[in-house]
Swiss-Prot record:
This is Uncharacterized HIT-like protein TC_0664. It comes from Chlamydia muridarum (strain MoPn / Nigg). It comes from the Bacteria. InterPro entries: Histidine_triad_CS, Histidine_triad_HIT, HIT-like, HIT-like_sf. A motif (Histidine triad motif) lies at residues 111-115. Gene3D superfamilies: HIT-like (3.30.428.10). GO terms for molecular function: catalytic activity. Coiled coil: none annotated. Residues 19-126 form the HIT domain.
Length: 126
């Protein structure tokens, strides 16, 4: 038996499958703009800017704080994808890159992901 939550599905055993894992598996439709062996990039369903993409590693890592030493190369790969997406979406002149880490950091889906926002003048956050 599965019980749905806002951001994933809880199995009878209590383990959580996030919405991102279900997207990666192809079980949930999304607006995918890029995919390779390690990442999928989708348009955010609730955009906070004219361009709002989510760069999601296929490897399940709950949050940035949980990364192991062999995971850090994913951040370098993500940087290259961010540059590519910025070019492809015409936001090279300015964009914001955000990782929300943990509940207090505003993370709502507990599968590491990077927000890429742009396409207009973004308000200050600091």
């Amino acid at each position: 038996m599965r019980r749905s939550t806002e951001f994933g599905v809880k199995t009878a055993g209590g383990s959580m499958t996030t919405i991102f894992e279900r997207i990666i598996e192809g079980a949930v439709e999304c607006d995918k703009v890029f995919e390779d062996e390690n990442f999928i990039v989708i348009k955010d369903k609730f955009p906070q800017a004219p361009v709002h993409l989510l760069i999601i590693p296929k490897k399940h890592i709950e949050k940035l704080q949980d990364m192991q030493s062999d995971d850090f190369s994913l951040l370098s790969e993500a940087g290259k994808i961010i540059q590519l997406m910025a070019r492809d979406f015409g936001i090279e002149n300015g964009y914001r890159v955000v990782i929300n880490n943990g509940l207090e950091g505003g993370q709502s889906v507990f599968h590491l992901h990077i927000h890429l926002l742009g396409g207009g003048l973004l308000g200050s956050i600091a």
